Amino acid sequence: MDTIIEEYLKFIQLEKGLSSNTIGAYRRDLKKYNTFLELQKISHIDFIDRASIQQCLGYLHDNGASAKSLARFISTIRSFHQFALREKYAAKDPTVLIETPKYDRKLPDVLEINEVLALLETPNLAKINGYRDRTMLELLYATGMRVSELIQIELEDVNLIMGFVKVFGKGNKERIVPLGDTVIEYLKTYIETIRPQLLKKTVTNTLFLNMHGKPLSRQAIWKMIKQNAIKANITKSLTPHTLRHSFATHLLENGADLRAVQEMLGHSDISTTQLYTHVSKSQIRKMYNEFHPRA
């Protein structure tokens, strides 16, 4: 099993172009799966059947796994067994009759427009790292891109004359996202004036750099967002995706086309984008309850 798992992980990295974070999640799920099978003395992939998978799911559930975690786990092992069958490592796929549990998708936390503006205005523009941070925050809110996508952007991906940025999303899929005048101005100053000061003697095409001239990490950007949110007196629970959620919700609240928002976010399934319409409706209900005299 260990060999097949490693071959599968190589496959999803090379053929599907998944990020290291996604591959890490797949690896953790498959390690749990393999550990359980070893405890059950199942030593060969063809000895796995529907009953052993259901026992594994029961074991994970009893140890606190949520319906969402189980759904992801099933998706991982289903993909793994399909690969094993296709590549002739196995004679059958035991996941065929396994159902994915349904779970309530949590509505994402969204910042109000005034909260976004407060967050954007927090970095100190007199400092080079402050100007860089303001530019990153502006770009995240202007495009709805993921933090993991932001750190991959290179200079040639940004076209300030035409007003767009190339974003490489999940599976290395490329999409073009338009840029507004405000973020274009910040990017122009950052690229021409701020980035050369950060670059120093380093040679890299990565757009956003730390104070040592190296590409910024996901963790560093997340830390920056949290610190600025505290300074802006934002009490909501933030995640690295909060500005992405806010971007989508604010567009839809102002009448943007759902499919256009789907395209900008890079969602392969429109049902994922539709989640933001529910956020908008919940905001409408909240306003109705607060302001209507007969609510």
UniProtKB/Swiss-Prot annotation:
InterPro entries per the UniProt record, alphabetical: CB, DNA_brk_join_enz, Integrase-like_cat_sf, Integrase_catalytic, Integrase_recombinase_N, Integrase_SAM-like_N, Recomb_XerD, Tyrosine_recombinase_XerC/XerD
Signal peptide start and end residues: none
Residue ranges constituting the Tyr recombinase domain according to the UniProt record: 106-289
Stretches assigned to the Core-binding (CB) domain: 1-85
Classification via PROSITE patterns: CB, TYR_RECOMBINASE
Transport in keyword set: no
Keywords: Cell cycle, Cell division, Chromosome partition, Cytoplasm, DNA integration, DNA recombination, DNA-binding
GO molecular function: DNA binding; tyrosine-based site-specific recombinase activity
Domain of life: Bacteria
Gene3D superfamilies assigned: 1.10.150.130, Intergrase catalytic core (1.10.443.10)
Major subcellular location class: cytoplasm
Compartment(s) where it occurs, according to its Swiss-Prot or TrEMBL record: Cytoplasm
Pfam families for this protein: Phage_int_SAM_1, Phage_integrase
Cytoplasm among keywords: yes
Function: Site-specific tyrosine recombinase, which acts by catalyzing the cutting and rejoining of the recombining DNA molecules. The XerC-XerD complex is essential to convert dimers of the bacterial chromosome into monomers to permit their segregation at cell division. It also contributes to the segregational stability of plasmids.
Protein family (similarity comment): Belongs to the 'phage' integrase family. XerD subfamily.
HAMAP family: Recomb_XerC_XerD, Recomb_XerD
Listed name of the protein: Tyrosine recombinase XerD
Organism: Staphylococcus saprophyticus subsp. saprophyticus (strain ATCC 15305 / DSM 20229 / NCIMB 8711 / NCTC 7292 / S-41)
